[in-house]
Amino acid sequence: MAKIAKTHEDIEAQIREIQGKKAALDEAQGVGLDSTGYYDQEIYGGSDSRFAGYVTSIAATELEDDDDDYSSSTSLLGQKKPGYHAPVALLNDIPQSTEQYDPFAEHRPPKIADREDEYKKHRRTMIISPERLDPFADGGKTPDPKMNARTYMDVMREQHLTKEEREIRQQLAEKAKAGELKVVNGAAASQPPSKRKRRWDQTADQTPGATPKKLSSWDQAETPGHTPSLRWDETPGRAKGSETPGATPGSKIWDPTPSHTPAGAATPGRGDTPGHATPGHGGATSSARKNRWDETPKTERDTPGHGSGWAETPRTDRGGDSIGETPTPGASKRKSRWDETPASQMGGSTPVLTPGKTPIGTPAMNMATPTPGHIMSMTPEQLQAWRWEREIDERNRPLSDEELDAMFPEGYKVLPPPAGYVPIRTPARKLTATPTPLGGMTGFHMQTEDRTMKSVNDQPSGNLPFLKPDDIQYFDKLLVDVDESTLSPEEQKERKIMKLLLKIKNGTPPMRKAALRQITDKAREFGAGPLFNQILPLLMSPTLEDQERHLLVKVIDRILYKLDDLVRPYVHKILVVIEPLLIDEDYYARVEGREIISNLAKAAGLATMISTMRPDIDNMDEYVRNTTARAFAVVASALGIPSLLPFLKAVCKSKKSWQARHTGIKIVQQIAILMGCAILPHLRSLVEIIEHGLVDEQQKVRTISALAIAALAEAATPYGIESFDSVLKPLWKGIRQHRGKGLAAFLKAIGYLIPLMDAEYANYYTREVMLILIREFQSPDEEMKKIVLKVVKQCCGTDGVEANYIKTEILPPFFKHFWQHRMALDRRNYRQLVDTTVELANKVGAAEIISRIVDDLKDEAEQYRKMVMETIEKIMGNLGAADIDHKLEEQLIDGILYAFQEQTTEDSVMLNGFGTVVNALGKRVKPYLPQICGTVLWRLNNKSAKVRQQAADLISRTAVVMKTCQEEKLMGHLGVVLYEYLGEEYPEVLGSILGALKAIVNVIGMHKMTPPIKDLLPRLTPILKNRHEKVQENCIDLVGRIADRGAEYVSAREWMRICFELLELLKAHKKAIRRATVNTFGYIAKAIGPHDVLATLLNNLKVQERQNRVCTTVAIAIVAETCSPFTVLPALMNEYRVPELNVQNGVLKSLSFLFEYIGEMGKDYIYAVTPLLEDALMDRDLVHRQTASAVVQHMSLGVYGFGCEDSLNHLLNYVWPNVFETSPHVIQAVMGALEGLRVAIGPCRMLQYCLQGLFHPARKVRDVYWKIYNSIYIGSQDALIAHYPRIYNDDKNTYIRYDLDYIL
């Protein structure tokens, strides 16, 4: 529009032009009536579809219904719906928390299952086996055939079948891989199972009488690469066709009768987990589009195995489902989320394949309708799911004739079906899915809220601890209130054990203690079966915590002692649960496991242990073999190696299976690791048993044999080389023939044998083996590197190897291949490399090694610098700096200064290294001290607290060297700088500054110290209030040092002020702080006199806190020792008159420590304190008598031989009546006093007191007197001879020993 229209024609033309342009506009640019408006996308976001997030159709078949329902589906109108929310930029700024974030997760006690790796999770697939037969029961009678216990023969047969089955599976898998499996018969996929029992070695195509079904061209087109469905060719546990309810795989919808599929391995093997059928593996590829509404359901299944979903149409066969089956992840069939079982459906990880009567939780959890009693043991999610399921089942219930009559008017009748009509039995799904309906109403009714479930009690009644949701499946019977008198004896026993176990697992310590004592005392009464059937499933629980496991293991330990031989039928059960503890990462769990298996072996005996564990030795599962080997080693240590040797010999020479040989040799290895030098008497026998394994045809057996030899040699070090003569040759051949893991094991064995040899042999073997080691230096395998380093260290540590040989042959390739950045990253490699390098330095000298690595102190990788520094520190710590020349010394100081300044991590490697190097160089450091101090002062000003702390720590490491170099002026300057930094706010840094001041005070002395002590100490007094342990410890050490050496520089008033501050430090948790504090009281008392300090301390006896009072009594005793007892005793004895329990006990405690510390000086004070002790020993309060007995003990031991027997005899008359006390603390103190008196007044007097009660008619009296007599006898056996009472000769016997009457 160049110009404005003025005339009528121009205006008309302009209007026409605009209208033309408008008409030409693309229709799509307009806004439709039902479409959305244009919004600012950056404000409102832009979800295009108004139906986004909704499912727009329900698929007719499961195949169409994908799992990714939540992706943006195409809407009905193909348009998007705008979202209204905060601006995107703002949302991006808000940190989005991860889904289901649990704020309490880090404070929750960790579960054992959470930290297990894949290998250790095997333990949960183990089955707690049924009881075994005890051949030794009833004196070895023939067992009753009615007993269901499995014999050794049954177990071995089962093991054999499992092994055979696994081998056939492997062969089939290999054939399938190689494409050698051929179609034997076109109908192999749909062949019905044979009626008679099939033999293990008979394949499916040999079954007679199977009528083949012709495949239609449709089916053949759908199943390319058709393979026969052999019995072994199937993944166990899941029958084909059970994915869709009742569907027959590969069948068309018009097929009139469902065809059967072979019933897989209906019984999975011991280690097999039930899972889905492998897709396409058995020729059962389902048709492309199946309509599940038209399919004919199967009312009976050959193999149960479809987890019931709560929201599906009910089926008649719901009750027959496999209990607790867990679907295999990544299964062959994509399931619709509408048919999915809720995630929380019950199914514990505790194996559910348990045969026999071993309880495994509540089976009814997984059934469609639990009985009312089981409802209580569900978790809230399961309860909710069950409610929904029940409601849907109730609605879909078929109507009865009576209900139909009530609904329809009269005149209707039921039509008979036409002749020959075969119904499609889809409505069969709508038959009741609830075998035990819980009495629901029929027809229409007002839906009142169901309150019954809300009142379900999820906590046991009575005095029982809180029940966690995880425990409900084990303790559900306690939730049901029953009259126990109506129960059978077995049920009563079961409830009793349940209650005790719940108290032990979840109760308070007193409750736990009582329950543990009760279950131990009644163990034989309860019986082994009921006890283990409840304890062992608890130990297999996937939600068990460390503390709970510890307590349950303690229960087993206690009851094993009581049950003794009754435990035999349950040995395998216990081992299945306890063996995994032997490979636990927690050391204490491993020790507990060993303890249990050791006690079990002693209770059950060797024969039972061997017959029980023998089948597991050649188990196909490596996990079982590994844990069995470790358990056997524990049995050997418990019952002695000789008793197990014949068995081990047989196992290691087994011809049938290499697994048995492998496990037998592993047992020998584990025995060596477990028992150490205790194997020496049996070393030759053990070596002979396993030597043939070094030339076995199986690679794994050869490897474990070499590792076992290495373990035996390590345990025998430095003895026993002659026992290994027979294995040297095969080992020697082995290291030339093997590569990889085998070679690593053989090298390890040689490495442990060389240190046992004489020097000349060691030298020869080292030179020979070194060629192979140097070749393996460049191996990329981490395990090989560790072993090579270890062997180099062992070879170079032996006497026969010369330094020259190491310098020329080993060091160049060693540094080339090992001193690399990668080695510093792995902790185990790092440690091994440092140790090996230090060992090489011990042979060739410090300078040779340090000169090769000193430049690496300036490397850019910090972890590598740390490795270099640690090596230098250890070498110089061992060898000093004598052979380090001036040039190397400069490089070293320069390097460590650089490394120290560049460090960023918070460990002490650099600090320790710096300190060690500087101290090793000694006076040679003087030229570098200004540079070092400059660096330290600069870093004390750094804004980073960590840097300041390291600088202060470095001063305390180098103070001694500064003194050696006579740099007192420099130290004085440092002291002033540190004094100025006492206002530091970070406690870690303040602690280091105090430590540095303490180091300077120690070396420079009190009189030369700057700042002067009179200025320094008042500055320290307020710091004593700091509650940080590091600050407290360093501060009290510094104050104590000043009080000891420079007390005269500070006024008495300041020391008293410090005394009051010190009382607070007696509350410290750390023992070192309390010890330093009580010692400081002694120094202060020495400086300013005992009276003021003593007054402060005596007042502190009145406090409530026990730890505080005990420390105060120790301080009083130290003051007495420092300032002579006569300055303290009058005030102390006067304080005893205060009629307060704590004060009197404190005084007695002080006297106890006082007499312990002053020893023989006590002879001057014994008569003074006797009246006080008389009173205390007659007091009603037990603690008074206990403490007074302790005083008598220390006093009598101190004054032995100083002629104070009269007073001590007087005190003995007061101590003696307390011998009948039952309190363990009191009786311990009384026995201690009697021991002390035995030394001081002689065993004769004690024997005279003792003889009165040795033959007393009352047993309790005799017990006490014999206990006292035994202790006198142990202490003074020879001295008693002269004091036994005279018994005169009679007609038959001569009792008098005349030679004892001779007097010269």
Swiss-Prot record:
The record marks 469, 587, 1035, 1049, 1141 as: Interaction with RNA. Phosphorylated. Phosphorylation occurs concomitantly with the splicing catalytic steps. Phosphorylation on Thr-244, Thr-248 and Thr-313 by cyclin-dependent kinases promotes interaction with PPP1R8 during mitosis. Citrullinated by PADI4. The modification N6-acetyllysine is found at residues 141, 214, 554, 562. InterPro entries: ARM-like, ARM-type_fold, PP2A/SF3B1-like_HEAT, SF3b_su1, SF3b_su1-like. There is a cross-link at residues 214, 413, 430 (Glycyl lysine isopeptide (Lys-Gly) (interchain with G-Cter in SUMO2)). One of its GO terms (cellular component) is nucleolus. Residues 547-550, 1156-1157 are annotated as: Interaction with PHF5A. Residues 100-119, 124-148, 172-360 are annotated as: Disordered. The modification Phosphothreonine is found at residues 125, 142, 203, 207, 211, 223, 227, 235, 244, 248, 257, 261, 267, 273, 278, 296, 299, 303, 313, 326, 328, 341, 350, 354, 426, 434, 436. Residues 104-119, 231-241, 291-304 have a biased composition (Basic and acidic residues). Keywords: Acetylation, Citrullination, Isopeptide bond, mRNA processing, mRNA splicing, Nucleus, Phosphoprotein, Repeat, RNA-binding, Spliceosome, Ubl conjugation. The keyword Acetylation applies. One of its GO terms (biological process) is blastocyst formation. There is a cross-link at residue 413 (Glycyl lysine isopeptide (Lys-Gly) (interchain with G-Cter in SUMO1)). Component of the 17S U2 SnRNP complex, a ribonucleoprotein complex that contains small nuclear RNA (snRNA) U2 and a number of specific proteins. Part of the SF3B subcomplex of the 17S U2 SnRNP complex. SF3B associates with the splicing subcomplex SF3A and a 12S RNA unit to form the U2 small nuclear ribonucleoproteins complex (U2 snRNP). Within the SF3B complex, interacts directly (via HEAT domain) with SF3B3, SF3B5, SF3B6 and (via HEAT domain) with PHF5A. The SF3B subcomplex interacts with U2AF2. Identified in the spliceosome C complex. Component of the 17S U2 SnRNP complex of the spliceosome, a large ribonucleoprotein complex that removes introns from transcribed pre-mRNAs. The 17S U2 SnRNP complex (1) directly participates in early spliceosome assembly and (2) mediates recognition of the intron branch site during pre-mRNA splicing by promoting the selection of the pre-mRNA branch-site adenosine, the nucleophile for the first step of splicing. This is Splicing factor 3B subunit 1. It comes from Mus musculus (Mouse).
